[in-house]
């Protein structure tokens, strides 16, 4: 800006290309071999890939974003081994996939580097009962969280099941408990604390004590001070993307 004599730069890492580029082919193999192939196609160097050993016989990705293809492959593995995965940049210019929630190594405590902490919980997305119906709208099964109903009251949804399908798994995914989140700020900054990893926080006033999952991170340098601001989650959730069946 000419008036303020301040130059502002906006920089993207190479995940920009993963998020905005399409792929158009049928992939096969393990996620840890599929993802480097995607990176090679886009001219991006690949880094460490979380090992799964899960073989995917066919994964059609016609006109899909590269990010979606990566998550489809690792979602297939997650269904078998129960792990959570996330792609991110490592060593400045390499796309890697790691097990989401891996401890970053940083610890934030009130007597050392923690300068601010907030905590909140909300019932806005609460769902603790799902009624599964047939095509004629008859209830054929109920999936519920009895403890949540007793504690918070009943919020239910209706899910229609298609012929020949079992909607139980989908109904379980629709259950949502109280959502808790927190934000913390710390000085000095620690570059190990980035989204996708987890961190240890020890702050007794808010009750933030234990391992939390970093959902977003901001690292600021101003007036000789390096500060990190983190948004934390209490659950380790993965951005799941299903492989679509071809007809």
Region locations from a protein language model:
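Intrinsically disordered, low-complexity terminal/linker regions enriched in Pro/Ser/Gly
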Residues: 40-48, 54, 239-247
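Short beta-strand-centered interaction patches in the first periplasmic/extracellular domains
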Residues: 6-18, 48-118
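Solvent-exposed, acidic/flexible segments
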Residues: 24-32, 62-70, 192
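Flexible, active-site-adjacent loop/turn segments at secondary-structure boundaries
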Residues: 16, 25, 57, 124, ...
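Surface-exposed cap/loop segments at beta↔alpha junctions
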Residues: 1-50
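Acidic, small/polar-enriched beta strand-loop surface segments
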Residues: 71, 83-222, 234-240, 247
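Sec-exported extracytoplasmic/periplasmic mature domains
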Residues: 39-44, 75-79, 201
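Short, solvent-exposed secondary-structure boundary/capping segments
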Residues: 1-13, 220-233
């Amino acid at each position: 800006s000419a008036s303020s004599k301040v130059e502002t730069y906006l920089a993207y890492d190479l995940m920009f290309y993963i998020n905005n580029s399409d792929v158009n082919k049928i992939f096969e193999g393990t996620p840890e071999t599929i993802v480097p192939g995607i990176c090679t196609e886009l001219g991006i160097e690949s880094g460490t890939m979380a090992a799964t050993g899960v073989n995917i016989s066919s994964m059609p990705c016609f006109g899909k974003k590269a990010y979606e293809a990566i998550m489809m492959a690792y979602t297939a593995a997650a269904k078998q081994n129960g792990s959570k995965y996330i792609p991110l940049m490592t060593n400045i210019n390499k796309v890697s996939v790691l097990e989401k929630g891996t401890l970053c190594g940083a610890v934030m405590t009130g007597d050392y580097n923690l300068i601010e902490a907030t905590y909140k919980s909300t019932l806005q997305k609460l769902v603790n009962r799902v009624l599964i119906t047939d095509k004629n709208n008859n209830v054929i099964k109920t999936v519920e969280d009895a403890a949540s109903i007793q504690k918070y009251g009943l919020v239910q949804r209706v899910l229609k099941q298609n012929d020949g399908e079992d909607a139980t798994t989908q109904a379980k995914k629709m259950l949502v408990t109280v959502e808790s989140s927190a934000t913390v700020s710390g000085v000095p900054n620690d570059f190990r604390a980035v989204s996708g990893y987890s961190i240890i926080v020890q702050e007794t006033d808010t009750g933030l004590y234990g391992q939390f999952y970093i959902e977003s991170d901001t690292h600021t340098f101003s007036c000789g001070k390096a500060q990190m601001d983190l948004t934390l989650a209490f659950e380790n959730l993965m951005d799941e993307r299903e492989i679509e069946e071809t007809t």
